[in-house]
Amino acid sequence: MFDRKLTLDKVDPDLWAAIQKEDERQEQHIELIASENYASPAVMQAQGTQLTNKYAEGYPGKRYYGGCEYVDIVEQLAIDRLKELFGAEAANVQPNSGSQANQGVYMAVLKPGDTVLGMSLAEGGHLTHGASVNASGKLYNFLSYGLDENEVLNYAQVEALAREHKPKLIVAGASAYALHIDFERMARIARENGALFMVDIAHYAGLVAGGQYPNPVPHADFVTSTTHKSLRGPRGGVIMMKAQHEKAVNSAIFPGIQGGPLEHVIAAKAVAFKEALSPEFKDYASQVVKNAKVLAETLVKRGLRIVSGRTESHVMLVDLRAKGITGKEAEAVLGKAHITVNKNAIPNDPEKPFVTSGIRLGTPAMTTRGFKEAEAELTGNLIADVLENPHDEANIAAVRAKVNELTSRLPVYSAK
């Protein structure tokens, strides 16, 4: 039998030490990676339960193993809460990631070689929307749309491509696009050209749930998402769909691309969906958008350009060329100042993908720890201070001290 007193710190001190260092890093640094957030203690607790011991191939009420009566309750809670949160007709909570959620939809409705429209990775899309290095781009005939001359999603291009190529599926959604996407218009283009319509809201899901970003569920045949990022849940994926597609999607996930579901993670998803249904989460989503607006405006005042001119969401792409610094260099030097960002290509970027001319910033994590407009403005100024003098160690140290004061005042997890 196991002794509950033999906790991780006693069983594996080396691993525990690394985890403690990561905890310190998360507490001390301002986290601005748009795809990252902090999960609640309840979400993390769910992932550490005995549910990790249970195999449960199949779906609630239709399992291939015995002893699933309680994991059925867990998974059904997650399904019902997800449907309530977004107004979906049907939902699958088993995908282990957003990428697998997308793959599940593709497997459900496409055959190898079918034509699909997706947003170009170089202009803000995602790997799984047809990038040549990804399985989606290898298995299917993806055609890419992008941005117009104002760096706004080019709906006219989508319409022209759809008319010319008559795709089986049109995919909307992005990993680095700051503005609202007109899902109703995209759905109309799909219908007029005989295509199914899928939306990947991995980045925007928390804002959609909080009423701060358009909800694609009424317009799309399929909506996929991750459950971390702006939803603040565990790392995982989900698929929402019209009822007529439920059987095909469920079969594509299991047995199509996955085996036994991770019920401990599904439990954590259920917790996150309950949290997202609360009035407090709507306040959180609203603050995320307010903070992003202030952060973007502050950076513009300090001489930096925001791709698309502004943000209407949680995320923004910052063009660094005016400062004479690459995204790779900016990521490194801001990291020294305890500000965590990721390098990111800008549209028509002249630099290589591992270098880039931009950085991507997001406000979900900073907002979770309690940052409001004043802290967002200060953060923007601290970023600009570093980028204006990236090789001045004294300047970096001064910014780091201000960051440490700010993060110590607003911890992620209170000590109480």
Swiss-Prot record:
Gene3D superfamilies: Aspartate Aminotransferase, domain 1, Type I PLP-dependent aspartate aminotransferase-like (Major domain). One of its GO terms (biological process) is glycine biosynthetic process from serine. SUPFAM superfamilies: PLP-dependent transferases (SSF53383). The modification N6-(pyridoxal phosphate)lysine is found at K229. Its EC number is 2.1.2.1. Keywords: Amino-acid biosynthesis, Cytoplasm, One-carbon metabolism, Pyridoxal phosphate, Transferase. Pathway: One-carbon metabolism; tetrahydrofolate interconversion; Amino-acid biosynthesis; glycine biosynthesis; glycine from L-serine: step 1/1. It is an enzyme of class 2 (transferase). Its cofactor is pyridoxal 5'-phosphate. It comes from the Bacteria. Transmembrane segments: none annotated. The keyword Amino-acid biosynthesis applies. The keyword Electron transport does not apply. GO terms for molecular function: glycine hydroxymethyltransferase activity; pyridoxal phosphate binding. The record marks H228 as: Plays an important role in substrate specificity. GO terms for cellular component: cytosol. It catalyses: (6R)-5,10-methylene-5,6,7,8-tetrahydrofolate + glycine + H2O = (6S)-5,6,7,8-tetrahydrofolate + L-serine. It is found in: Cytoplasm. Catalyzes the reversible interconversion of serine and glycine with tetrahydrofolate (THF) serving as the one-carbon carrier. This reaction serves as the major source of one-carbon groups required for the biosynthesis of purines, thymidylate, methionine, and other important biomolecules. Also exhibits THF-independent aldolase activity toward beta-hydroxyamino acids, producing glycine and aldehydes, via a retro-aldol mechanism. HAMAP family: SHMT. Homodimer. Belongs to the SHMT family. This is Serine hydroxymethyltransferase. It comes from Bordetella avium (strain 197N).
